[in-house]
Each structure stands twice: as structure tokens, then as C-alpha cells.
Amino acid sequence: MIALALLLQGSLPDSLPPKPAVAPSAWLSLIGAYASDHDTLYVYEDGGALVALLRPRAPMRLAQAAESLFTFSGRGPYDADRIAFRPGEIQVGQVVLRRLQMGPADGGQLRLQPVRSVTELLRIDHKLTPPAETGAFLAPDLVEPSRLDGTIRLDIRYATTNNFLGTVVYSSARAFLQRPAALALVRAARVLRPLGYGILIHDAYRPWYVTKVFWDATPPASRWLVADPARGSKHNRGAAVDLTLYDLATGAPVEMPSTYDEATPRALSDYPGGTSRQRWHRALLRRVLEAERFTVNPSEWWHFDFRDWQRYQILNVPFERVR
């Protein structure tokens, strides 16, 4: 109770440092991942300095010697003392590493070419039945968090063409969760509000037939990106939410280490790259939601599962029929 009271007064969650300064804009084009045939070297900003990380070595701070030349704080990777940045690559000693294109630009979206017509799949899969389940499940009680707290906003990508299939999938831009999960999200929003942040939901309850559409439309080699409809997903149970933070003062989404729905290492919940502020935003979101007993998906910093998801069964109710 004491910790919650402190949060409601605008204090940061335990173990979270103060909000870092914005990284110098000149460094943003240098930050990223660079690869040779054998290694991947990450360049990121931490505490107002550029840092180079080549695992299993410890991170090494860089000092700027010229516009595109930095020196290591000690003997660097490949026994080098400096790192030179060039368009599309870096040189560390005698080793040249090419810059990896890790994902879409800020605000962009992963795209796949559907192998079947999404419109046709929506018509067909809508009529199918989810896999049978047995157990003592709780009765479904789906509610809309945005109706419980006015600071919770929506950017439902599957109700637009700005999603991985490039096609509208949802019939309306709505987000439902089982009531206990929705109330937990409202409590999280109340914690974030004094800190100047609100919650922006990208997806929540997903009818099972939509999961089937995703599976059927996705190329087989890329199906690791989507849930298997034979097992259903936590989204189908109304117990998972995809979300980020937005700035209450401007209404703009905050910067995170990756874009939403990005299928690259930047999406990992512990990805070390990016800027201090991006990682701080990610950590703030995670700390506040974990305090409400959500669990982050290690592969997707934006995806959180509610603690009691196993107690709810797979649902296939269209948004318009949710009562």
C-alpha cells in the first residue's frame, strides 16, 4: 500500500532511475546493429554516451574523437582502439561490419504478403468453431478499458490497414479485456497519470476466427509470428493486451526501442540497444504493469498477459456481439 501511494503521488517505481535526457540527435543515425560473417556488434546510447557491445564482452563506452570517429575506453573488440562510422557500415580495427536493417522506421509496420485473400478468409473462418476445451473456466465478462478510464486511448491496428497484413481485419476499433484485467489496466493508468503518461492500446481481446485468419493468410515460413489457432491464444481469452505509452501533454506515443509488431531483436523485452530514454519508457511500462500482475512476453515488449489467463476459455464472439 505504501508503494502504491508513492506511485499515485508521481514517484517512480522501485529500481527505476530518473528519466534520462534525450540522446544527441547526431547519434541517432549511428545507433543500431552491425554484423560481420560471425559477429553482431550493437551501438547504443547509455547515460549520455555511445556504447559498443559485442557479446560476450562487457559493454564499452565510446568517446567522440571526430564527427564519425570514436575511441574505446579501453582495448576494444578485435583489439581495436577506435571505431569509424561510414554510411551503411562501421570499421573496428581491420574488421568491417555492415549495418543491419532491423525493422521499419519509427511508426512503421512489419508487412507480410498474404498467401490468401484476407477478405475471403474472414468470410470463411468466421463460420468455423474454435478448438474444444475442458475445465472449470470463469464466465466471460469482457469490458472496454477505455470506457473505464478516459486517459486510456486506442490505436487498434487491425481496424486499419496499418498492420502486418496491410488489410482491415477488425470490424471496429475497439479493445476488450476480461473485467479483472481491465480494472488492473485502469489501476496502471492511474499510476502513470501523475508521471505524465497514458496507456495506448493496440490490441486486446481477439476473436478466435481472427487468429485463424492470421494463420491462414501468413506464409508457412512466417507462421512463427502468429498464434496457432489449434491452441488458441491469450488474446482469444481476453487476457492479453498489446500496448504502449503516450505523452499526456502532447498525445504522441513515446519512443520505444522498436515499433509495434516488429519481428526483429529490437522487439525483445530485454533488447539492450536504442537510447536510454527508449529503454526507460519500456522499463516504466513493464514495472507498472507487472505491479498489477501482468507478465511481459519476452519476445514482444508491448505484449502483456494477465495473471489469470488460464482461467478463461477461448472465445469467438465478434465485437458487435460482446455484451
Where are these regions (language model features)?
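Bacterial N-terminal signal peptides
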Residues: 1-9
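Sterically constrained small-residue positions within well-ordered secondary structures
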Residues: 5, 25, 34, 43, ...
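Peripheral terminal and inter-domain segments
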Residues: 9-120
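K/E-rich alpha-helical interaction surfaces of small helical-bundle regulatory domains
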Residues: 28-40, 289-293, 300, 305
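A mature extracytoplasmic/lumenal domain signature
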Residues: 47, 56, 66, 158-160, ...
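Extracytoplasmic cell-surface/polysaccharide-interacting catalytic and binding patches
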Residues: 105-202, 217-299, 308-323
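Beta-rich nucleic-acid/ligand-interaction surfaces
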Residues: 208-214, 304-311
